[in-house]
Amino acid sequence: MNAPDKFTSLLSLTREPFPASHKCLIPGSRPDLNVPVRDVLLTNGETVSLYDTSGPYTDAKVEIDVRRGLPGVRGAWITERNDTESYEGRSHQALDEGLKHAHDHDAQRLAELRAGASALQRTPRRAKAGANVTQMHYARRGIVTPEMEYVALRENGKREWMAEYLANEERAKRVAGNPMGASIPRIITPEFVRDEVARGRAIIPANINHPEVEPMAIGRNFKVKINANIGNSAVTSSIEEEVEKLVWAIRWGADNVMDLSTGKNIHTTRDWIVRNSPVPIGTVPIYQALEKVGGVAEDLTWEIFRDTLIEQAEQGIDYFTIHAGVRLPFIHLTADRMTGIVSRGGSIMAKWCIAHHKESFLYERFEDICDIMKAYDVSFSLGDGLRPGSGADANDEAQFAELRTLGELTQIAWKHDVQTMIEGPGHVPMHMIQANMDEQLKHCHEAPFYTLGPLTIDIAPGYDHISSAIGAAMIGWAGTAMLCYVTPKEHLGLPDRDDVKQGIIAYKIAAHAADVAKGHPGARSRDDALSKARFEFRWQDQFNLGLDPDTAREFHDETLPKDSSKVAHFCSMCGPKFCSMKITQEVREYAAKKGVAEAEAMAEGMAQKSREFMAGGGEIYIPIQPAS
Amino acid sequence: MNAPDKFTSLLSLTREPFPASHKCLIPGSRPDLNVPVRDVLLTNGETVSLYDTSGPYTDAKVEIDVRRGLPGVRGAWITERNDTESYEGRSHQALDEGLKHAHDHDAQRLAELRAGASALQRTPRRAKAGANVTQMHYARRGIVTPEMEYVALRENGKREWMAEYLANEERAKRVAGNPMGASIPRIITPEFVRDEVARGRAIIPANINHPEVEPMAIGRNFKVKINANIGNSAVTSSIEEEVEKLVWAIRWGADNVMDLSTGKNIHTTRDWIVRNSPVPIGTVPIYQALEKVGGVAEDLTWEIFRDTLIEQAEQGIDYFTIHAGVRLPFIHLTADRMTGIVSRGGSIMAKWCIAHHKESFLYERFEDICDIMKAYDVSFSLGDGLRPGSGADANDEAQFAELRTLGELTQIAWKHDVQTMIEGPGHVPMHMIQANMDEQLKHCHEAPFYTLGPLTIDIAPGYDHISSAIGAAMIGWAGTAMLCYVTPKEHLGLPDRDDVKQGIIAYKIAAHAADVAKGHPGARSRDDALSKARFEFRWQDQFNLGLDPDTAREFHDETLPKDSSKVAHFCSMCGPKFCSMKITQEVREYAAKKGVAEAEAMAEGMAQKSREFMAGGGEIYIPIQPAS
């Protein structure tokens, strides 16, 4: 049992609370409803309270045993609704682990892993016959679920500490966001959450078999969320690494994680991930289905796919990417593209359609899929299998034909009260981004948009977290509800631990930039708290309020390693003899001393002087045409 | 003489040509006018030709001796104009080296450095009595200078190779940029350059004492340029490091470099930098003037400042940041800011104005400054000393009052035919960026805008190259002509070699994203060439066409280190058994085989089927109001 030990020691690194931070719980209307926030204690005695995705891992008081999984936050809420039942579930099959990769598979090791963590293999629940257990179904019946209340408390956080920053009316008016059509209330109520879910403008991904999830919402009237992808592949990686990547990803702020495993042990990997995840987990079930048919796309069948959906729904996957918009009549539209079909799911389905010369079974069986989704409350993430793989292919007919189809499918899903979001590109130059949002809003009826980037240029391999963070920030501002991260390894290889972090931080920047631009009060206030700390030379507070306190501190210490410099009223850019912020403090004292009245009188005098000066020469405008 | 040897070995690292690349010269109308481009030879036999800022350093045929400086590209052009004269110039003074820092100054070492590279100390030129030697002055008289022709050839590059990518009409129309008011011709002529310079919409920073410069233009109708800052400070750094940083910065694509040194040996450092720089060098002369008065802002005088301008103009500095818009009547406007005055130059002048209760001597002596600028063709970079230091302070009255003043000063500068650009912020949330461009265009009459970022959020210390690349890309698209980079160390410490590179790459991404969005044909085509290489699994070409081939190759090799994988038709993301790009190639063959006619007929049949399907349930729209 070496592997779990290695894992536990890796995990201990990610369990450290953030500096000067502790987990705090906002109590809800019932004893088992408590919403976590991260309180950062500043050196001036103030507290700033931040949205916290990291789950119990950063709570020093909680004992974690990854072989048993996390406690089930939602356990009682689900059973109390009395519309679900336990059942034996589908039995575990060798094929579920991707056994077509038999040549590199170690059955002995798999058996050990499963035996060593048998608590992670749970008895599943499903809707009772005829019941629909989706959050949308409850919402449309006017029921405010504990999940909705949880989301409301979480989106608000502790508004008290923001008061100081929101009080300055002149400033608040000047920097007020441009919500670009979003309607973000000052205070999010549980009823508001219910209404957003009911009308399909937000989803709360929360499979009834994932009681460990801390509920969160994806919708344009909430904070912009980010998704991180993890997953082994045929070439590299291991179960332990993937679970640790999950904990690492949520530490840095991933709101959702997609498990894109394609290699061996994928069923057991998924058990480990879901049971240890406080954030919703998404998958692309066609990947596993393909493994079951040995990687031969044309051998896929509806039955194998359906069985895979049930397998994963029973494990607790919160949303499925389903590429049901890749229809046979659209495939030839990609033939003249610069980069064809680049979505893996899209090309699997394209290959299937071509091989059989038939319409996609995902499209034709869409209502059957809805029936499975609503029995577990799995949300749709309608995949954009025909998304552009280069700027040259952006916004073409293949892409938009699929998007319109996703709009049709959204209405079918909503007929079944199945929660739905829509995936978007990909590679889109800046000037073509807004059209993506406009088309999505128009055809998909405000279902949440969930985009990959988009990358704004194609020439930055090794830096596509940056080329895409630009597009992500812009489309987030425009109304996209969740941004799927891109790591520096995009197009080149598999992200390691540091790549995952780099991708997440870039996307936290993009999402926060979007929140600030939209006018989210919590976003603006965190910026202000850090700016104030920066201006007042509270170095520790500046680090601790940042997205990555460790890196900020390390960078600072490279130039000025002495502890004393962290309270000094200067920094390494200007040195001890001169500092612009120090001078500004003198300006402030000057203005206070002189009084604004005098300053304004002086301004008038100077303006007069300026007019004289300009009259003496400044106003003689020389035509700028060349003489000849 | 250990230091120069250390330097030479450092430099050899940055003299390696880029992989598969060689320097190529586009001949102009005279034998001494040859414009460098970097030709990248692809594995399929094609050549892609790129804009090249790296100067002779990446030309294996050129012998470099940093103690003698670069050859003077413009030497004959300047003397042939017969409007300048050599003169003895100002004598070197101990004070020029920042000797007020006497406690940490090593006079012996300085003497050695100067003696070991005495060729770098040149006899200066200036305009003959009554002459005006600015590019703007020539342009307004209808003269197309060699500098203007050089810029035209450089902006075009080799358009031949782009033909393939520009030929696809459907695509060209779909992805055509939105120039946001810019007017970028398909082919840049020397006459177009002249006209842009004449009307002040572009500048060619090219001091007559910097003949080594390879002329380039900054203007919204040319490619978006980037600036990198280097410079020692009172706390760290050395001359050798600064020169090597210059060569390193232009290798990665800096179009301009600002030397912001504030510490010891600043005069000699500047000689080294200018004589070895093929790109324009900018400075903030008030920094050196402050050194001369021992760091006491109130001791600054017009005479000391004027002498510093002449000192630097004689050395060949191409543009001066002058904070002449920081006027006494504006200073109290910053008193209620979250972060006051954060520009170093701005706070120096604010302190001076307060101490003397007098209007800024930079403002009052502005026409005297113009007289100096036009005698050497130093361009103005009118500094934004009151730029916001946080999102909370963005677009406030202090900032815009200064901007309007910079507009007034631009007209005075233009009266003297002095080339002028305008500096801009700083920290601006996304939704407030466009207003900055609008105000600048309105008040500054299309003089080129040169912004620092802007940073879109404040909570990313350690990652502000990313938070600002977002703002830089957006404002570049909106019409900003040059983007001043921000490194990961911003707000935290002094950038080292790797930070400089990270900052530059982030800004090359921003500038290129802006060029693509504006519709620059050269930008779009490079994206397309890389995308095509990516789609065709030409891994080496994908690396070599990227902004940083080394990093792309290294990232790829981490996962698949074998050389064989670089020609393999798969990558590490999907593995050898399945690959979306491989499937796309099958789609393409399928579409070609079936023929588009059949595909379209099939599409119609499918659409009919879809309509039937939808009629059977899809159209029953369930109202989404909750039941209760």
UniProtKB/Swiss-Prot annotation, chains A, B:
InterPro entries to which the protein is assigned, alphabetical: ThiC, ThiC-associated_dom, ThiC/Bza_core_dom, ThiC/BzaA/B
Molecular-function GO terms, alphabetical? 4 iron, 4 sulfur cluster binding; carbon-carbon lyase activity; zinc ion binding
| Pfam families, sorted | ThiC-associated, ThiC_Rad_SAM
One GO BP annotation is: thiamine biosynthetic process
State the reactions this protein catalyses.
5-amino-1-(5-phospho-beta-D-ribosyl)imidazole + S-adenosyl-L-methionine = 4-amino-2-methyl-5-(phosphooxymethyl)pyrimidine + CO + 5'-deoxyadenosine + formate + L-methionine + 3 H(+)
Residue spans making up a coiled coil are: none
Q: Where does Zn(2+) bind?
A: 427, 491
Which pathway does it serve? Cofactor biosynthesis; thiamine diphosphate biosynthesis
**What does the record give as EC number?**
4.1.99.17
Q: Which domain of life is it from?
A: Bacteria
Q: Where does substrate bind?
A: 229, 258, 287, 323, 343-345, 384-387, 423, 450
Q: Is Transport one of the keywords?
A: no
Name the job this protein performs. Answer: Catalyzes the synthesis of the hydroxymethylpyrimidine phosphate (HMP-P) moiety of thiamine from aminoimidazole ribotide (AIR) in a radical S-adenosyl-L-methionine (SAM)-dependent reaction.
Summarize subunit and interaction data from the UniProt record for this chain.
Answer: Homodimer.
Family statement: Belongs to the ThiC family.
Give the protein's recorded name.
Phosphomethylpyrimidine synthase
* Organism of derivation: Variovorax paradoxus (strain S110)
Gene name as annotated: thiC
